[in-house]
């Protein structure tokens, strides 16, 4: 992880942002030790430092880690993030629109973050349709930092979108009615009739056979 952090900093230069995703996978003592080691690479935040639910574990991590913490990827409602904001644990909220109650719930959670000076940095591993909704929310939130984006996992020719992401990572906003996407219903019907193996990110297993949610 030290090597990857150093390489990431070198690739993006002094003005780029480097984030570290702990993916709830590290015991607190290891995370605390690692955070101290990668701090030299000016890490913007540590994402998912622990499994959500035990606020005392997050308090312990926050007490020892100087890098800002980002939480909220697995949050479903405002009640899931309130404790982390009230206890001043989270500097960033990573709400995932696909996990919450849609645009309305995400806006409420982003507003709560703003009240506590926690910037929005949405988590998003989704289709073009989901990304369109994310962009609509992100564009309307004053305290917005960055939008996670992966090249589309949407089946080819299924969705025509009215936005794009350029080579520098900047996204244009949807320009057509609604979410800014048009669904090819004939293609959707075709796909629904064709059995297929689930692709990333729903594989569920790593190369060594171990189980993973990614």
Kindly give the residue locations of the regions a language model identified.
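Shared catalytic-loop signature of beta/alpha-barrel
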Residues: 36, 42, 51-178, 182
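Structural signal for hydrophobic packing residues in well-ordered secondary-structure cores
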Residues: 9-12, 42, 138-142, 192-195
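C-terminal extensions of enzymes
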Residues: 159-214
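Alpha-helical structural motif
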Residues: 4, 130, 184-187
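Metal-dependent enolase-superfamily TIM-barrel catalytic cores that perform enediolate-based chemistry
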Residues: 3-65
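Short, intrinsically disordered low-complexity segments
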Residues: 1-3, 8, 192, 202
């Amino acid at each position: 992880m030290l090597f990857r952090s150093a390489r990431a900093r070198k690739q993006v230069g002094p003005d780029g942002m480097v984030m570290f995703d702990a993916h709830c996978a590290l015991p607190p003592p290891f995370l605390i030790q690692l955070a101290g080691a990668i701090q030299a690479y000016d890490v913007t935040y540590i994402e998912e430092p622990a499994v959500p639910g035990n606020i005392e574990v997050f308090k312990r991590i926050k007490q020892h880690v100087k890098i800002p913490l980002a939480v909220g990827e697995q949050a479903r409602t405002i009640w899931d993030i309130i404790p982390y904001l009230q206890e001043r644990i989270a500097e960033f909220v990573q709400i995932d629109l696909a996990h919450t109650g849609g645009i309305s719930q995400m806006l409420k959670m982003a507003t709560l973050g703003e009240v506590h000076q926690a910037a929005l940095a949405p988590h998003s591993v989704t289709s073009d349709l989901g990304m369109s909704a994310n962009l609509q929310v992100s564009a309307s939130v004053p305290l917005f930092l960055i939008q996670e984006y992966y090249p589309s996992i949407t089946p080819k020719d299924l969705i025509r979108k009215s936005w794009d992401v350029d080579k520098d990572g900047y996204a244009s906003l949807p320009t057509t009615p609604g979410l800014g996407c048009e669904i090819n219903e004939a293609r959707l019907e075709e796909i629904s009739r064709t059995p297929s193996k689930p692709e990333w990110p729903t594989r569920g297993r790593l190369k060594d056979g171990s189980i993973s949610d990614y």
